[in-house]
Amino acid sequence: MCSIGEDDVGDEGATHAMVAESLPTGIVISPGDCNKCGVVSSELYKLNFRVAECRDCFLNHARHKFRASLGAAKVLPRNAEVLLAVDGSAESLVLLDMLHFAQTQNTFRRLHCNARVVYIDDQSVHGGESMNLQALQALGTRYEPLEFYVVELGASACSLQRLGQYSTSLKEPNGLNTKLEKLRSLTARQDYHQQQRKNLLASVAQKLSCSHVFEPSVSGDLATQLLTSIALGRGGSAALDVALLDDRLAAGVKLLRPLRDLNEQEVRFYVHACQLKPLRESGSSYGQERGQTASLQNLTAAFVGNLQQNYPATVSTVFRTGDKIAANAHMEQASCAQCQSPLDAKLSDTLLAIEYSRAVSEAGVGLSKDGDASESLAKQRLEFKDGLCHACRCIQLELGYDTLS
């Protein structure tokens, strides 16, 4: 049970009560015998709950998790068209390397699919330095014959270009920055940023005739996503946010998460073993530079990161819980126009209370004295058929007259 009491939760969201990060355990840079194959190795890899093993045994272990996640569930048809989303993070490069390795094996062990790679350039949204085009071109050379494409976040899929033809100076006008600036809270901006990225992936996959998209989310990312989805009001679709297969994307495109069984330590070791060079640092996603308490997503990520450091097995338990809390599916149930989450079929008392509070705050003293009028206004808002879930409706309210899409 949690040892943090209610009195310990202050304005910082209990981050002050977190245990300080411990030093990571891992690579033993010393000669020794591999406990798996017995080969003398100059570098042993010691994962949590596993014996020290050589580089080849560790890579076999990590790559087996990737193949097993796809093979056990049989979610990837033979010769499927696959789009791999690369953002330059360590996780995305690990997935790229695993996919390339699986496709270069002999016929018996080969992963039979046709893969393409897309890099979503979001530097204009981050406001930082321009993307490292040279490093991306080096990736394209290393992982030939995979085709690499680049598209800017906020642009249409029609602006998709091959890596060799892409130029950072030739970019379409981007309206995403304008919409992000209108959102008051970083929580809303990060949520909207994530939904726009996912919708762009679906559009690119449709343009390239890809039926499946590979997303490089590991166990820590999925645990954070599960808790965040519930907190934002998307509990009804939280199971799909962490599932191996997510079928909510447009045009029937299916999103797969083949790295969901890997943890942060395994990713770090894989990067070292294969000498990969991530294009962005860990924790440099949109909005994370603002600090742990700047948004709900950042605070949740800090909480899960602390669990990963001190109680590694707990993180896997958290995200696997998502598989067991799926809502009952109804064929006629409508979905959100923005995030494709199922809409609430019944009037929720919780949402009614939220809208009631919002109506009182906006109306001022006059209407707040009339409880029936406030409750009636709250019900009207919930029953209004705008095609949005609660979380996306909150974003729409901050945007005003601008549309989400």
UniProtKB/Swiss-Prot annotation:
Pathway: tRNA modification; 5-methoxycarbonylmethyl-2-thiouridine-tRNA biosynthesis. Keywords: Cytoplasm, tRNA processing. One of its GO terms (molecular function) is nucleotidyltransferase activity. Pfam families: CTU2. SUPFAM superfamilies: Adenine nucleotide alpha hydrolases-like. Gene3D superfamilies: HUPs. InterPro entries: CTU2, Rossmann-like_a/b/a_fold. The keyword tRNA processing applies. GO terms for biological process: protein urmylation; tRNA thio-modification; tRNA wobble position uridine thiolation; tRNA wobble uridine modification. Coiled coil: none annotated. GO terms for cellular component: cytosol. It is found in: Cytoplasm. Belongs to the CTU2/NCS2 family. PANTHER family: CYTOPLASMIC TRNA 2-THIOLATION PROTEIN 2. Plays a central role in 2-thiolation of mcm(5)S(2)U at tRNA wobble positions of tRNA(Lys), tRNA(Glu) and tRNA(Gln). May act by forming a heterodimer with NCS6/CTU1 that ligates sulfur from thiocarboxylated URM1 onto the uridine of tRNAs at wobble position. This is Cytoplasmic tRNA 2-thiolation protein 2.
